[in-house]
Amino acid sequence: MWSMGLIRRTAMSNAIRASSQRTWLGHGGLRSCVTVKTPSEDEEEKKKEITIAEAKKLMRLVNVEDMKKKLVGVADRDVVSYSTLLEASQGMGIARSPDEAHVFARVLDDAGVVLIFRDKVYLHPDKVVDLIRRAMPLDQNPEEDQIKEEFNKLRIMKEEIDVLAHRQVRKILWCGLATSMVQIGLFFRLTFWEFSWDVMEPITFFATATGIIVGYAYFLMTSRDPTYQDFMKRLFLSRQRKLLKSHKFDCERFKELERLFKMTSSCHAAASIRNRVGLELDLEDALQSRRD
């Protein structure tokens, strides 16, 4: 009897270990249910909370430049408040809660994408580093200083060229709008005062057909849809290419120095142009246009 009781107790203990959800205890014909939290439930709760590793993965998947451009467009400067960064991360769907937004902000700060200091977010940490270097000069190689100075001169020249090209494009577009308004006014005058609709109907028809033919010819020559956005981009690149050539701007040298200092074009005037007109422009486009 003692051995049978021992076997029963051993079997019961094994059953308790094998059960992942409940343990049944028999005592005096009564049974009580005790719930045990399984490891799978703990894993599900952990999955609901964002971790630093998951936030880093999100940072790699999300286009951080779009987020920075949105912040620059809202604040119109290089510094925004910490609450603005949290609201932007939640508004873009990066974070689902304020806690996740705080974690994502710390990841951006650790990665060097932004600089968080005293409830302020600096969107261009490289500019802060330049200011600190000017205030506290470090021991640098004279050759490195010369290269840095050369890069700053080329960057300033590039910004001036971009702004000038954008102004010329805007003037051309406004002239095109004025020409269209004059054409409509002329047709209106000829239709109701000088001639009649019977005379002007074929003229307006051929004028409209000419516009369609011009758009189709644009598609054949460029292999792109004849949209106003694409036309504006090509016009900007054309003016930029001419200005780069007239100012004798060394594009290859600029790209080399840009890669050397690991800086992106978001620091240049092209970023503000993208924010205003929505054009995705890069110096590679101008280089490709020059090769063509």
From Swiss-Prot:
One function term, GO molecular function aspect: metal ion binding
InterPro entries named among the record's database cross-references: MCU_C, MCU_fam
Recorded superkingdom: Eukaryota
Disulphide bridges: none
Residues noted as binding Ca(2+) in the record, renumbered to the chain: E201
Compartment(s) where it occurs, according to its Swiss-Prot or TrEMBL record: Mitochondrion inner membrane
Transit peptide residues according to the UniProt entry: 1-18
The keyword Lipid biosynthesis belongs to this UniProt entry's keyword annotation: no
Tissues and organs where the protein is expressed, per its UniProt entry: Mainly expressed in roots.
Disruption phenotype: Altered root length and mitochondrial ultrastructure.
GO annotation, cellular component aspect: mitochondrial inner membrane; mitochondrion
Membrane topology: Multi-pass membrane protein
Keywords: Calcium, Calcium channel, Calcium transport, Ion channel, Ion transport, Membrane, Metal-binding, Mitochondrion, Mitochondrion inner membrane, Transit peptide, Transmembrane, Transmembrane helix, Transport
Example GO BP: mitochondrial calcium ion homeostasis
Free-text function comment from the UniProt entry: Mitochondrial inner membrane calcium uniporter that mediates calcium uptake into mitochondria. Constitutes a pore-forming and calcium-conducting subunit. Mitochondrial calcium homeostasis plays key roles in cellular physiology and regulates cell bioenergetics, cytoplasmic calcium signals and activation of cell death pathways.
Similarity comment: family membership: Belongs to the MCU (TC 1.A.77) family.
Name of the protein described by the UniProt record: Calcium uniporter protein 1, mitochondrial
Record organism: Arabidopsis thaliana (Mouse-ear cress)
